[in-house]
Amino acid sequence: MSIDEAHEALGAYERTFQSHYFELLQQKLGLFNTSPHSSKANEKLILSLMTLLHQNHVDYTMFFRQLSSHALLLQTDASVSAAENETPLRDLFMDRDAFDAWSRMYKEALDKDPLEAVLRKKKMDRINPKYVLRNYMAQIAIEKAVTERNYSEIDKLFKLLSSPFDEHPDQQHYAGLPPDWAEKISISCSS
């Protein structure tokens, strides 16, 4: 394979990857109208969201999971505006004015997408997991197994993460932010 052919193959891969990634992000946002006009508007919405999430240090898993409830609220209550309502999703942001501006753009996108609100929430909850394995969760399970020969935490995590999209009301604590001490956990490729 020549260098030009390799560059061409890499370019094709990048275009395919970007297309699928963008499609997945639209689904995570509950936007299923894939017309070219909607896709272009959704691209602007997604890019501004990614910047907003990064600037505000928002936990992506928590954001995307809570977004389905926010979308339902935006679609079912015409009087609702994020600026007037303290919502759990809004509370994730330090810059609430920026979130409010994004939320207004998001509502416009939802209004152009014909999917019924409750069905949208169900579809979003099936693509946005509530639970992911976080370093601190693995650390607790490892420490219990090593120091106490107690494998119950591993079993519990295995069961929980086997169905990460389900609510698991008795396991809500695993869906929250990591504890402060977890910032000190260091993971390497040889761990």
Tell me what each language-model feature is.
Residues 1-191:
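Regulatory N- and C-terminal appendages and interdomain linkers associated
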